[in-house]
Design a protein with these regions (language model features):
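Helix C-cap/helix->beta junction micro-motif
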Residues: 14-15, 104, 165
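Gly/Ala-rich phosphate-binding loop of Rossmann-like dinucleotide-binding domains
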Residues: 34, 102, 163
Length: 191
């Protein structure tokens, strides 16, 4: 715990000296394929993040939005949304629309939640370049925050599935996710 405090202090000091602000909107917006819907309604977000995203709740709406982004010079987008009770983004109905966006040259990142090999392969085949994967390192945090019966290894498995499918897998480690307490973050770094 003491070592973690030292590392956090050092990270804060460095961020004050070298922090660059990147504002992706409007050239790289976040799009929710579920609108404001999320079965998890977890303690991490409580559907709040979904409110700030553009909504494209059907494959047709998503395709139109992606084509508009392409025609207006956007770089790409983050594809996200609410999760099922199993911690998964219901992306399968949207894969053809995503492929169309990729064919138009959009660079897309997805926040898919937990994924199996087949889904990871389908996401990669749709032309997405990267996947952002939450990496909680404490099973109790996963249960308390997300309400999932999953463990850190399930997130590692998702990351490996996405990486092996050809996507750039980007781990997200949220410090203090467990109600502000630091639990499992160092473990997540070692996974």
């Amino acid at each position: 715990e003491e070592r973690l405090d030292e590392l956090l202090d050092e990270a804060w000091s460095v961020s004050r000296r070298r922090l660059r602000v990147y504002r992706p909107y409007p050239r790289y917006p976040s799009i929710s394929i579920t609108g404001g819907w999320c079965e998890l309604d977890c303690r991490h977000c409580g559907r709040v993040y979904l409110r700030s995203m553009e909504w494209a709740e059907s494959p047709e709406l998503l395709e139109r939005r992606l084509l508009k982004l392409s025609s207006t010079g956007a770089v790409g987008c983050l594809v996200s949304g609410g999760y099922t009770r199993e911690g998964r983004l219901p992306v399968k109905p949207f894969l053809k629309a995503l492929r169309r966006g990729a064919d138009e040259g959009l660079r897309m990142n997805i926040h898919p939640g937990l994924v199996d090999r087949k889904t990871a392969s389908e996401i990669a085949s749709a032309g997405l370049e990267a996947a952002s994967v939450d990496m909680p390192g404490d099973p109790e945090t996963i249960r308390w925050v997300h309400g999932l019966d999953a463990g850190p290894r399930d997130y590692v498995r998702s990351m490996l599935n996405l990486s092996q499918a050809g996507l750039r897998a980007c781990p997200h480690i949220c410090v203090g996710l467990h109600g502000g307490a630091v639990r499992g973050e160092l473990n997540a770094l070692s996974l």
